[in-house]
């Protein structure tokens, strides 16, 4: 390794092909209204999906309409660009690399997300390809409908992606696959022709086949080939609920051959035939009644073998989860929401779970079905048969949704397994006849056990589909080879049971096994159909099949994987930067719902770079490129000088910064741009199934980045807020006067990069508490108190935001403590260091944290509760202090207001609720780290006879100083408008309460008047 005093410049990145650049320039000149992206960061962010593969595209296009897509296809048809290839992409949730390729990626998800038309009488809806599945269902719900094909990634998977993989999931035994609900498609052929598909009489299809157009050529080829080989198709295609797609030759014709539909061919085609831009979808009435029975087993095999009983009971769906997934769920935040719905059985170990749903419009019939099932289960338990150890009923819609959210998170939870080997997708969606599933799984498990692998299992046993993810370390070349060996063995095993390798998630890189399933004759028919649509193999080449007479190669299962890049990073670096390296691409951070706290920067920009997955992807590549140059970031971190910057280092940074401002390339700048967009809200550290803590590795990156480049002045001001705020508070009138001057605000915005700075409290906290006993106790006096005297004390831990900018709130808290019969003591202000951590001043943060931890540990020995008001700073003591100090942090505990109140009011009886309700807007960092927060606040208010409703919102957009930085102002206000503003417009402002200082500041800035803290409402109630 080379010894560095700063990170090296990473000046080389994979270059751009001139023909690609010319194509993009011509496209713009011809009126393309979408976005184009060619930076290395942009290309990297779309080089992976939820699979193990990695392929770097040459460029990315984000069309805004079908017209844009047609323009792309038309220009691509010109001879000058005949060498370019194109791949459509949706939500990027594919598990087998379906949308990964070189060439140009056409991403439909960013802009093409409009719901265009609905007809409730005829029960259909027309959408663009980028609409997310849950987005559509949220739109349909007020009409009483839903789009029934289900999948675990429904909050970020696009309908275009679902169509291209013919996705299905829970409930498919009743609802079928996506293709069963697609009434018609608008597709764009390479060359720019529009193809509108729908079921048509075969006679009309034959007439269309005679037209001298690309559409006619397609109709001619498909009609001829599918009719000629009809008997072979019916013989070869398994008669499974999860029928064979890509290409679905069987369903192009109706059973009586009187109807013909190209739609069925495009469904499951993975973008290899055309660009799908719009779809007309069948919609299903929402069932009036839903019931779930959670059945618990002593073994996973028992759960599998008991599944036919559920199918006989006419259940809508049967979802099975094994003990590995259950144990991972128990360690995740999601378990908080379901633990009362899936309780433990005394003296029994739950090693399997069947989630059985009944749904329909006849409540009486469903109740009878459940009663009969429960009677069977009781008999099995009495006779100690079938491995049934207990069951629970749930008829609450919210509870049912929480159960399925846990099940949906199972995929990601497996990625959070401990150790270097991680459960990965490559044989995860095999389908066999349901009656053979249990025996098949016995052999499957024996196969994996023979390789000494651990694995997790869950899935849709009613449909014969079980998701199996063997744990492999893909940084180990030997285990990478084992992955291919296991794939081959599972292909053979599945064939023996009359099943499919691809029962649910599409083929992707696994299409190399297609000839074995289809046979040579039918596989060649697939190739002829590919040739009719895409004769020169330019649409997602290498997937499904290659055109007939083409010598082009198929993608291979053992193609380039993420692990082959990650293994180039030294092991020590991989271990210490685990947060970035362990992202498995599950994409939960792409959740479309504005009320979901993760990830606000992704929600407002719709740019994958500005997501936890994007930032993790860029960081792992940055670490790899550092390793290429012999730079060890771990060693560099250890050698950072403790003292101030030397003159030589300062001059070097000034020179590097000057060249950077002149446009000198460094990949580190692209990573820095991604990190600068992060709000450091920490939602990812709890909401992500893998617990990818972006703020943690972001602060490390910033520290290293600024060994080479100067920091902006605003960074120093933010990091020093806890030093200068106490000094400014000595003369708030003077500083507030200057802060209000137009020239000062203009100077701050233009030269410092800060806007809308808050005013200092006047009168100050010290003035408001002048003469109050809370101000007059020293630590020594506290230590001298007797046990009886200490029992009445409550110690208030100050933070810089409420103490110096919201002093009245601190004063009100002290008054509340007194009214509850306790004696408040305001501890001396001791810097928290949160702002230093956010900006990557980690050495300063370590010193601050060490000093404050020593102080708080000394106070903690007194045995009196310590309580802080601002969630972000209090939680910093629990999280960042642990990360930085380890065991040296000690065991002090600072409670949040609601935590202390919840304890202090345990003996107080709940009073009869009366009066108008209050509305709680909880701080996003607080509610993700402590999901019980809203419920505890509600319990507290109930003890004073007040009703408190929790308002489900995402981030407010302020996030400490993020919203005060000029470069973030537009996004900050945009994030606020996503969920906070609409909710506040519906509610009486004076009854709305917010726990976060940042949240209250943002509301005041945008709405003109602020919100109060819940404790201030309690003060009013007492």
Swiss-Prot record:
Residues 53-286 form the FAD-binding PCMH-type domain. Optimum temperature is 45 degrees Celsius. One of its GO terms (biological process) is lactate catabolic process. Optimum pH is 7.5. It catalyses: (R)-2-hydroxyglutarate + A = 2-oxoglutarate + AH2. (R)-2-hydroxyglutarate binds at residues 407, 505. PROSITE patterns: 4FE4S_FER_1 (PS00198), FAD_PCMH (PS51387). GO terms for molecular function: 4 iron, 4 sulfur cluster binding; D-lactate dehydrogenase (cytochrome) activity; D-lactate dehydrogenase activity; FAD binding; metal ion binding. Its EC number is 1.1.99.39. [4Fe-4S] cluster binds at residues 678, 681, 684, 688. Activity is completely inhibited by the addition of 0.5 mM Mn(2+), Ni(2+), or Co(2+) and partially inhibited by 0.5 mM Zn(2+). The lineage of its organism: Bacteria, Pseudomonadati, Pseudomonadota, Gammaproteobacteria, Enterobacterales. Residues 667-700 form the 4Fe-4S ferredoxin-type domain. Disruption phenotype: Disruption of this gene leads to the significant accumulation of D-2-HGA, and thus impairs D-2-HGA utilization. Homotetramer. Keywords: 4Fe-4S, FAD, Flavoprotein, Iron, Iron-sulfur, Metal-binding, Oxidoreductase. Catalyzes the oxidation of D-2-hydroxyglutarate (D-2-HGA) to 2-oxoglutarate. Appears to be the only D2HGDH in P.ananatis, providing the way to recycle D-2-HGA produced during L-serine synthesis by SerA, by converting it back to 2-oxoglutarate. Is involved in the utilization of D-2-HGA, that can support the growth of P.ananatis as a sole carbon source, although it barely serves as a good substrate. The physiological molecule that functions as the primary electron acceptor during D-2-HGA oxidation by YdiJ in P.ananatis is unknown. It comes from Pantoea ananatis (strain AJ13355). In the N-terminal section; belongs to the FAD-binding oxidoreductase/transferase type 4 family. Its cofactor is [4Fe-4S] cluster; FAD. This is D-2-hydroxyglutarate dehydrogenase. InterPro entries: 4Fe4S_Fe-S-bd, 4Fe4S_Fe_S_CS, FAD-bd_oxidored_4_C, FAD-bd_PCMH, FAD-bd_PCMH-like_sf, FAD-bd_PCMH_sub2, FAD-linked_Oxase-like_C, Oxid_FAD_bind_N.
């Amino acid at each position: 390794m080379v010894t560095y005093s700063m990170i090296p410049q990473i000046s080389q990145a994979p270059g751009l092909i001139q023909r690609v650049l010319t194509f993009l320039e011509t496209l713009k000149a011809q009126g393309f209204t979408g976005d184009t992206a060619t930076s290395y960061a942009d290309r990297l962010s779309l080089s992976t999906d939820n699979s193990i593969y990695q392929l770097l595209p040459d460029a990315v296009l984000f069309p805004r309409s079908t017209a844009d897509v047609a323009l792309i296809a038309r220009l691509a048809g010109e001879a000058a660009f005949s060498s370019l290839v194109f791949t459509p992409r949706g939500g990027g949730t594919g598990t087998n690399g379906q949308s990964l390729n070189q060439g140009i990626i056409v991403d439909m998800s960013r802009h093409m997300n409009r719901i265009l038309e609905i007809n409730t009488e005829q029960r259909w809806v027309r959408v663009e390809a980028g609409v997310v599945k849950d987005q559509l269902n949220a739109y349909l719900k007020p009409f009483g409908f839903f789009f029934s094909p289900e999948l675990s990634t429904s909050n970020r998977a696009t309908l275009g992606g679902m169509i291209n993989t013919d996705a299905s999931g829970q409930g498919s035994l009743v609802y079928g696959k996506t293709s069963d609900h697609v009434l018609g498609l608008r597709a764009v052929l390479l060359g720019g022709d529009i193809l509108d598909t729908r079921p048509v009489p075969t006679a009309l299809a034959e007439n269309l086949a005679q037209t001298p157009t690309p559409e006619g050529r397609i109709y001619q080829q498909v009609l001829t080939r599918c009719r000629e080989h009809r008997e072979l198709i019916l013989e070869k295609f398994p008669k499974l609920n999860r029928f064979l797609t890509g290409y679905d030759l069987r369903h192009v014709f109706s059973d009586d051959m009187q109807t013909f539909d190209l739609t069925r061919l495009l469904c499951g085609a993975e973008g290899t035939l055309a660009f799908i831009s719009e779809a007309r979808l069948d919609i299903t009435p929402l069932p009036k009644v839903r019931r779930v029975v959670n059945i618990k087993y002593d073994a996973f095999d028992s759960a599998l073998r008991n599944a036919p009983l559920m199918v006989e009971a006419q259940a809508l769906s049967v979802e099975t989860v094994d003990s590995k997934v259950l144990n991972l769920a128990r360690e995740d935040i999601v378990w908080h929401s379901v633990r009362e719905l899936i309780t433990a059985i005394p003296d029994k170990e739950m090693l399997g779970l069947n989630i059985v749903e009944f749904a329909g419009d006849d409540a009486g019939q469903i109740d009878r079905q459940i009663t009969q099932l429960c009677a069977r289960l009781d008999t099995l338990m009495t006779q100690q048969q079938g491995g049934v150890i207990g069951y629970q009923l749930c008829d609450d819609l919210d509870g049912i949704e929480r159960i399925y959210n846990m099940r949906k998170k199972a995929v990601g939870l497996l990625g959070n397994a401990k150790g270097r080997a991680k459960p990965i997708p490559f044989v995860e969606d095999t389908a066999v006849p349901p009656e053979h599933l249990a025996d098949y799984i016995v052999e499957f498990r024996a196969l994996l056990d023979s390789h000494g692998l651990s694995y997790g299992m869950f899935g849709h046993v009613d449909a014969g589909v079980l998701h199996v993810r063997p744990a492999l370390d893909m940084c180990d070349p030997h285990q990478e080879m084992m992955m291919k060996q296991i794939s081959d063995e599972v292909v053979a095993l599945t064939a023996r049971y009359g099943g499919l390798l691809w029962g649910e998630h599409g083929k992707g890189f696994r299409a190399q096994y297609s000839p074995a399933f289809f046979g040579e004759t039918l596989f060649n028919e697939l190739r002829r159909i590919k040739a009719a649509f895409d004769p020169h193999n330019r649409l997602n080449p290498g997937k499904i099949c290659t055109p007939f007479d083409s010598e082009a190669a198929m993608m291979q299962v053992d193609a380039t994987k993420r692990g082959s890049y990650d293994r180039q990073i030294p092991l020590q670096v991989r271990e210490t930067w685990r947060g970035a390296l362990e992202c498995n691409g599950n994409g939960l951070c792409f959740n479309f719902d504005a009320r979901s706290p993760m990830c606000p920067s992704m929600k407002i920009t719709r740019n994958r770079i500005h997501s936890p997955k994007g930032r993790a992807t860029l960081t792992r590549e940055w670490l790899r490129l550092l390793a290429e140059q012999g730079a060890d970031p771990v060693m560099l971190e250890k050698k950072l000088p403790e003292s101030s910057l030397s003159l030589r280092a300062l001059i070097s940074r000034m020179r590097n910064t000057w060249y950077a401002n002149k446009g000198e390339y460094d990949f580190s700048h692209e990573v820095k741009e991604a990190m600068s967009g992060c709000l450091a809200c920490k939602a990812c550290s709890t909401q992500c199934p893998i617990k990818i803590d972006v703020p943690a590795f972001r602060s490390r990156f910033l520290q290293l980045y600024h060994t080479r480049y100067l920091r902006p002045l605003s960074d120093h001001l933010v990091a020093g807020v806890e030093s200068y705020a106490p000094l400014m508070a000595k003369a708030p009138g003077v500083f507030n006067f200057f802060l209000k001057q137009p020239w000062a605000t203009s100077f701050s915005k233009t030269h410092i990069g800060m806007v809308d700075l808050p005013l200092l409290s006047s009168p100050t906290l010290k003035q408001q508490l002048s003469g109050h006993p809370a101000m007059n106790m020293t630590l020594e006096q506290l230590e001298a108190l007797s046990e009886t005297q200490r029992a009445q004390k409550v110690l208030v831990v100050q933070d810089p935001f409420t103490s110096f900018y919201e002093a009245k709130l601190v004063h009100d808290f002290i008054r509340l403590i007194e009214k509850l019969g306790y004696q408040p003591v305001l501890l001396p202000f001791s810097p928290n260091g949160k702002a230093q951590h956010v900006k990557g001043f980690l050495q300063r943060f370590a010193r601050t944290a060490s000093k404050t931890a020593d102080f708080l540990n000394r106070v903690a020995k007194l045995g009196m509760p310590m309580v802080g008001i601002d969630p972000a700073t209090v939680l910093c003591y629990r999280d960042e202090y642990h990360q930085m100090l380890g065991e040296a942090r000690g065991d002090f505990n600072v409670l949040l207001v609601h935590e202390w109140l919840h304890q202090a009011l345990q003996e107080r009886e709940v009073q009869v609720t009366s009066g108008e309700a209050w509305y709680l807007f909880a701080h996003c960092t607080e509610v993700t780290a402590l999901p019980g927060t809203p419920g505890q606040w509600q319990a507290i208010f109930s003890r004073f006879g007040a009703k408190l409703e929790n308002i489900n919102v995402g981030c407010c957009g302020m996030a400490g100083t993020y919203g005060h930085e000029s470069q973030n102002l537009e996004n900050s206000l945009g994030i606020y408008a996503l969920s906070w503003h609409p909710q506040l417009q519906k509610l009486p402002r004076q009854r709305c309460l917010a726990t976060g200082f940042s949240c209250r500041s943002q509301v005041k800035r945008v709405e003109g008047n602020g919100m109060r803290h819940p404790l201030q409402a309690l003060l009013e109630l007492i």
